[in-house]
Amino acid sequence: VVKGVLLTVFLCSAAQASEMEEIIVQARAVDESVRDIPVSVTAFSEEYIEKYSLKNLEDVAMHDSSLEITRQNSGSGAAVGLRGIKSSSSTLGIAPSVSIIIDGAYYPSARVVNEGLFDANQVAVLKGPQSLYFGKNATAGVITVKTNDPGDELEVIAKAGYEAEFQTTTLTGIISTPISDNWGIRLALQSRESDRGVLSNDAPDS
């Protein structure tokens, strides 16, 4: 059973006639147009994430050729790289080359790649050194994830899904409500259970 709570940022553009809407990202903690950011950025909106069923950062990597995520054999960790630059996934003493920022908080462990994107508002991948804004652990780039904020009205969302190949049942619940003029709370939970694709390696008692 895999449970997660989550994450991300992005306003997507749409081509209409020959014009494109301005793409706004919050990768550096403020609203900025992609045209004004002096770095290479790939941004994924909430609509894009839902349309292509991006469940986690590994799925995001399949839609961005510069992003590479390599799991350890044990599955407990991962090495995240951008443009071919990445640190070892198993060496704790080595700082990662790519920072992962979720809602403005730095996550030092690449295990966060397991977190779900089911309540993500935007995911942005900034390529190239970003130490000026994000510190030393961003020599290759940064992945920022922004989750949805609480709204001005009560919101309740319930979803259920089933995937036949691995017999996976997914249940999602989201509740959001304001508690004052300036404060609100949002809770997002997801449970996934698969009957196939998981190997149980049970050792006999010694």
State what each model feature region is.
Residues 26, 58, 62-103:
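Extracytoplasmic beta-strand/coil segments of soluble accessory domains associated
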Residues 97, 109, 118-121, 131-206:
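Outer-membrane beta-barrel translocator/receptor signature
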Residues 41, 49, 60-61, 123-128, ...:
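Non-catalytic regulatory/gating segments with a bias toward low-complexity or hydrophobic composition
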Residues 90-91, 97-98, 103-129:
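Short acidic/polar hinge/loop motifs at secondary-structure boundaries
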Residues 19-21, 37-40, 63-65, 76-78, ...:
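Envelope-exposed proteins and targeting segments
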Residues 27, 102-104, 147, 177:
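Residue-level signature of outer-membrane beta-barrel architecture
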Residues 1-19:
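Cleavable N-terminal targeting peptides that direct proteins into the secretory/outer-membrane pathway or into
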Residues 17-50:
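Short, acidic, small-residue-rich periplasmic hinge/interaction motif at the N-terminus
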